[in-house]
Amino acid sequence: MTTFTHINSQGEANMVDVSAKAETVREARAEAIVTMSKETLSMIVEGKHHKGDVFATARIAGIQAAKRTWELIPLCHPLLLSKVEVNLEPLLETNQVRIQSLCKLTGKTGVEMEALTAASVAALTIYDMCKAVQKDIVIEHVRLLEKSGGKSGHFIAEEK
């Protein structure tokens, strides 16, 4: 059975020692879905939101969040990310925005939390910028899509 890596033999939370691990190329992709009204999505897509470019702001927020994950999530290592990408895709038929993030580095620990944080904060930024026009926006399906590198190998999430 696999054990929790952040719990020591006394049952206490601690930061994992990665000093003996080999550096490998590591990559992770994550996504979040933001559901809103047709009117709110149209306002964003048509560039008519009074706060400015919602997608550009959410993209930058997601990138910044990935870089600061270690400050937000206890026990995460500070990482020297080599790439962070955040893409936002309006899904007009379902009144949703699909956010997908990619994080990459060559290092001793994975970038799953950075990718998940990027997608999550981009989604939260959309909510923040749009809450004045719609309070019941829903953020859902935040999940890891894929990870590679490291001893646990390659993971690809099942399609939803």
From Swiss-Prot:
Pathway given in the UniProt record: Cofactor biosynthesis; molybdopterin biosynthesis
Keyword terms of this UniProt record: Lyase, Molybdenum cofactor biosynthesis
GO BP of this protein: Mo-molybdopterin cofactor biosynthetic process
Residues annotated as binding substrate: L75, C76, H77, M113, E114
Active site residues of this protein: D128
Reactions catalysed, as given in the entry: (8S)-3',8-cyclo-7,8-dihydroguanosine 5'-triphosphate = cyclic pyranopterin phosphate + diphosphate
GO MF, one annotated term: cyclic pyranopterin monophosphate synthase activity
Keyword Transmembrane belongs to the record: no
Origin superkingdom: Bacteria
EC number from the UniProt entry: 4.6.1.17
Gene3D superfamilies assigned to the protein according to its UniProt record, in alphabetical order: Molybdopterin cofactor biosynthesis C (MoaC) domain
Record carries keyword Lyase: yes
Function description: Catalyzes the conversion of (8S)-3',8-cyclo-7,8-dihydroguanosine 5'-triphosphate to cyclic pyranopterin monophosphate (cPMP).
Subunit structure: Homohexamer; trimer of dimers.
Family membership: Belongs to the MoaC family.
Name used for this protein in its record: Cyclic pyranopterin monophosphate synthase
Organism for this UniProt entry: Haemophilus influenzae (strain ATCC 51907 / DSM 11121 / KW20 / Rd)
Taxon lineage: Bacteria, Pseudomonadati, Pseudomonadota, Gammaproteobacteria, Pasteurellales
